[in-house]
Amino acid sequence: MGARWWLCCFPKETSAHRPHSSPSSDPLPHPTSSAPPAGPPFVSIPSAAAGSTKEMGAKLPYAHVDARLRALAGQAEGFGRHAIGGLHGPVYHVTSLADDGPGSLREACRIREPLWIIFEISGTIHLSSYLRVSSYKTIDGRGQRIKLIGKGLQLKECEHIIICNLEFEGGRGHDVDGIQIKPKSRHIWIDRCSLRDYDDGLIDITRESTDITVSRCYFSMHDKTMLIGADSSHITDRCIRVTIHHCFFDGTRQRHPRLRFGRVHLYNNYTRNWGIYAVCASVEAQILSQCNIYEAGQKKVVFKYMPEKAADREEATSGWIRKCFQCLGTLPNMDYGASICGSQRGSPVMHRMASITKTSRLVVPPKSLCVAAVIGYK
């Protein structure tokens, strides 16, 4: 199975180079002719009649989104659905693979205005330190193959970030994650990225960061894959809300994810051959797992409960995981309403655990529905 089945690659735009272009709708070629294969079996894509290229293109994931550059904004499913990235800013063209300097990705990410960042070249960017991303940015790797190595992206006290079609590999150093989201960041969408082999996590979401969607990403060659919620002393992480869907966890050892305090919705993910467990619920975690495939290797524990004591509680708890392996229709209830965190709500944050089963209903589009199972587990 190819590691890049989920990435949409387009021919390079033919417009002349410019550091910024106007925020008008910059067209990309229609994805029909260069669309990726359907991918692993858990992605449910209707078949088209032989020779019906136009019909097939319309049914591939994101066909309506990838036809034009800025159509991606606001198209996430789940808690990160409001992320608009650099929708209202100019287009920034990355022309250099250098760590810093004119035309580099780092220069674009530090600019304090909305930007839609695209790449004029393919290649590897060696990061000597975390690349901090400021608010209202889209880092759009469609059309090129961009790999970040050495360090990762840091989303610190920012909002409205879209990260699409990038590779992350070989991050080295203490507390080095592929994508580190902390503190107090929100409205984030990570889509169609490949992450592997970092010294710490691949994606870590902690310290009051919320309203985040991770979709159609590929995770491999790693231990502590995805941590959500810092530790049992950070009770303000009760506001965290994350959706993870259509992701492939391929032989990663643990944390798919591991959750403390917050709420996580998992659907249409494929996790196989983990090394310790698949999903872990720690202190006050609330996890809704729907239509996922868990294919065990030598280790058979899928859902692990790890009790911890919150700093403001007397007894240790492990939270809960609600499992649904067949859901062909409207999904059970998940609260996708407003989230209030930290200073936005007042201090201290002391709200009760919200019920997933008694709130508003989420209807996942038909392209997202499938029947899933747990294979060889206990």
Where in this protein do the model-derived segments appear?
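Acidic Gly/Asp/Thr-rich repetitive segments characteristic of extracellular carbohydrate-active
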Residues: A71-I117
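Extracellular beta-strand-rich solenoid/capping regions of secreted or surface-exposed proteins
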Residues: R106-E113, T124-T138, K147-C164, G170-K184
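PEST-like, low-complexity acidic/proline-rich intrinsically disordered segments
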Residues: M1-R18
